[in-house]
Amino acid sequence: MHAKVGDYLVVKGTTTERHDQHAEIIEVRSADGSPPYVVRWLVNGHETTVYPGSDAVVVTATEHAEAEKRAAARAGHAAT
């Protein structure tokens, strides 16, 4: 797993009651882009250092925005 500042970390929900968790990567603590990452969780703005597990993926800001647009379209809402 490799990331850069501005990418997003998405931790996949494991059940229908537990939704995916999204965080913006605001700091990468290694020169090669590997974990740990300092992230800001979108749901509450909390910042923390994470070592992502196998249930997490890194996506670019563009990929994240496109996924949000698709999700909003499925839900019948306009993406912002």
Swiss-Prot record:
Give the domain of life. Answer: Bacteria
* Matches recorded under InterPro entries: DUF1918 (IPR015035)
Gene Ontology CC annotations of this record: peptidoglycan-based cell wall
**Thermal dependence:** Is rather robust, being able to refold back into its native structure after being heated to 80 degrees Celsius.
**The family this protein is said to belong to:** To M.leprae U650M.
Binding partners and assembly:
Monomer.
Q: What is this protein called?
A: Uncharacterized protein Rv2302
- The scientific name of the source species is Mycobacterium tuberculosis (strain ATCC 25618 / H37Rv)
